[in-house]
């Protein structure tokens, strides 16, 4: 199998602390770059765990359409600003950050006081502007999760009247782009490919770590396929037809034929279906006349039995 390597050729950190990494992966066989690019992109964009603000509580506010005395932004603006805060929690438990700021002041994400388990990535993110003589007291709830989680207003755990819920976007990767370049032709004339991948994160995770996590998830996904064990499918016994379940008595056979069959442990049509014409003649005291009688009775209900064992 062709050995390839991955090189990070570019790494940038923007003013909002988002990070961009550009990677070159190769050389690859034809078609492998598309396979890698699509697989990594899907996992990077939708399956990595991240942290998001899920709810906000503001002192004196019990609905999102309110205004706060002395605060320039209305509650909806504050909720939107809080939603855009980038945080990184190292615990799966709910974490709460709190702040109390007296004006005049511009309240920023760095003013939030969390436990040591939570890091505020973009501390300069503005939350609100408080005028002189006024103050703002609020708390934000942050959680870890995957993907997107809409507000659940019917959840009793989060339905407190003063707890303003937010649609949570846990995805730490904002954008993934990739292109495929052909490299020099190898010995034997087989062309090679190189995958160029750009990964942009929110800053709570580096592009390098994002690539590594995505790769590990794909390994875990495919690993069971390497140890597939074949299990023979047990064929189900065919369900007996309605005709096969007809009892021997309903064939209206002669007393002689009926008694001979009963002594041979034949109790229903399904038992007869295991016989050929030759088998019937071998039943004790069962002559050709009785055998013909059975054949005619079976034909009346649409069932035929073979003449000999070899034709069965």
Swiss-Prot record:
EC number(s) on file: 2.7.7.6
Pfam families, per database record: RNA_pol_A_bac, RNA_pol_A_CTD, RNA_pol_L
Catalysed conversion reaction: RNA(n) + a ribonucleoside 5'-triphosphate = RNA(n+1) + diphosphate
Keywords: DNA-directed RNA polymerase, Nucleotidyltransferase, Transcription, Transferase
Catalytic EC class: transferase
Alpha C-terminal domain (alpha-CTD): annotated segments: 239-312
GO terms under biological process: DNA-templated transcription
GO CC entries: cytoplasm; DNA-directed RNA polymerase complex
The keyword Protein biosynthesis appears for this protein: no
One GO molecular-function entry: DNA binding
Coiled-coil positions: none
Location of the region described as Alpha N-terminal domain (alpha-NTD) in the Swiss-Prot/TrEMBL record: 1-229
HAMAP family xrefs: RNApol_bact_RpoA
Free-text comment about domains: The N-terminal domain is essential for RNAP assembly and basal transcription, whereas the C-terminal domain is involved in interaction with transcriptional regulators and with upstream promoter elements.
Protein's job: DNA-dependent RNA polymerase catalyzes the transcription of DNA into RNA using the four ribonucleoside triphosphates as substrates.
Family in the record: Belongs to the RNA polymerase alpha chain family.
Subunit structure and binding partners: In cyanobacteria the RNAP catalytic core is composed of 2 alpha, 1 beta, 1 beta', 1 gamma and 1 omega subunit. When a sigma factor is associated with the core the holoenzyme is formed, which can initiate transcription.
Protein name per the record: DNA-directed RNA polymerase subunit alpha
Lineage: Bacteria, Bacillati, Cyanobacteriota, Cyanophyceae, Synechococcales
Gene that encodes it: rpoA
């Amino acid at each position: 199998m062709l050995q390839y390597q991955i090189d990070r050729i570019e790494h940038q950190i923007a003013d909002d602390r988002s990070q961009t990494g550009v990677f070159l992966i190769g050389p690859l066989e034809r078609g492998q770059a598309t396979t890698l690019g699509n697989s990594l992109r899907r996992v990077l964009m939708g399956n990595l765990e991240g942290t998001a603000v899920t709810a906000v509580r503001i002192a004196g506010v019990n609905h999102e359409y309110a205004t706060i005395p002395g605060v320039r932004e209305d509650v909806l603006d504050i909720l939107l600003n809080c939603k855009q805060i980038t945080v990184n929690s190292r615990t799966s438990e709910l974490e709460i950050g709190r702040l109390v700021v007296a004006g005049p002041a511009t309240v920023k994400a760095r003013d939030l006081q969390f436990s040591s388990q939570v890091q505020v990535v973009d501390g300069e993110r503005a939350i609100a502007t408080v005028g002189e003589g006024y103050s703002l007291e609020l708390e934000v709830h942050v959680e870890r999760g995957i993907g997107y989680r809409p507000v659940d207003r019917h959840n009793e755990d989060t339905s407190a009247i003063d707890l303003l819920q937010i649609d949570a976007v846990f995805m730490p990767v904002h954008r993934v782009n990739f292109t495929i370049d052909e490299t020099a032709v190898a010995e034997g004339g087989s062309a090679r490919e190189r995958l160029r991948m750009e990964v942009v994160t929110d800053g709570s995770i580096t592009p390098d770590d994002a690539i590594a996590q995505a790769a590990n998830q794909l390994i875990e996904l495919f690993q069971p396929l390497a140890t597939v064990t074949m299990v023979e499918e047990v064929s189900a016994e065919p369900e007996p037809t309605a005709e096969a379940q007809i009892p021997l008595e309903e064939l209206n056979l002669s007393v002689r034929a009926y008694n001979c069959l009963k002594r041979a442990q034949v109790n229903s049509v399904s038992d007869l279906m295991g016989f050929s014409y030759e088998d019937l003649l071998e039943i004790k005291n069962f002559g050709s006349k009785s055998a013909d009688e059975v054949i005619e009775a079976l034909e009346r209900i649409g069932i035929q039995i073979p003449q000999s064992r070899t034709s069965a």
